[in-house]
Amino acid sequence: YNIDKFHHAVLADDQVVFCVAKNHPLAGREVVSIQDMAKQPLIFFNADSVQNQLLKLRFELEGYTPNIIMRSSQIYTTLQFLKTDRYACFLYSSMTDKFPEIIGIPMQTPIRVKIGMIWKKSRYISSDMQTLISFTKKYYQMHSLIPSDKKTSGD
């Protein structure tokens, strides 16, 4: 994509973490490697997610194939599998504090992700869409996941 043709707002800067239940064998680790994760039965988000593409590429670059046993777009379903202490998944670190029954373990080589919104510069933006954009920007300013000095906006 040619980013010059879009307005954009970065809302969050986060990292992907390896998530397991508190009693999972890897729960006590400070960090996990791709090699460690490749041995685990993994639940990935649906195939078209950016997170999946980044994870699959990381596994491939390090010469491993992830042991994907299921794909789901439902976090609740994924968490039910994790509670059995046999499975693992990947979430953004900012999400893990919302689920006290799981532990998010940083990856040895982190995958950082900027989360934001983009919209075409050349398109008409309805007042409802402008309201949504303004609301979202204000919300993330008040509930920031990134320091205010690192926020960028390409309005």
Predicted features along the sequence, with ranges:
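Short beta-strand-to-loop elements that line the ligand-binding cleft
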Residues: T65-Q74
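Conserved SAM-binding loop
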Residues: F44, M70, A88-C89
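Thr-Gly-centered strand-to-loop micro-motif
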Residues: A21, F45-N46, L91-Y92
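Generic preference for hydrophobic
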Residues: H8, F18-C19, L42, I68, ...
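Beta-alpha-beta core module
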Residues: N2-Q15, Y76-S122
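A late-sequence structural motif
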Residues: I105-I146
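Ligand-binding cleft/hinge of the Venus flytrap
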Residues: N52-T65
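Flexible hinge/capping segments at coil-to-helix
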Residues: K5-V16, V20-L42, S127-M129
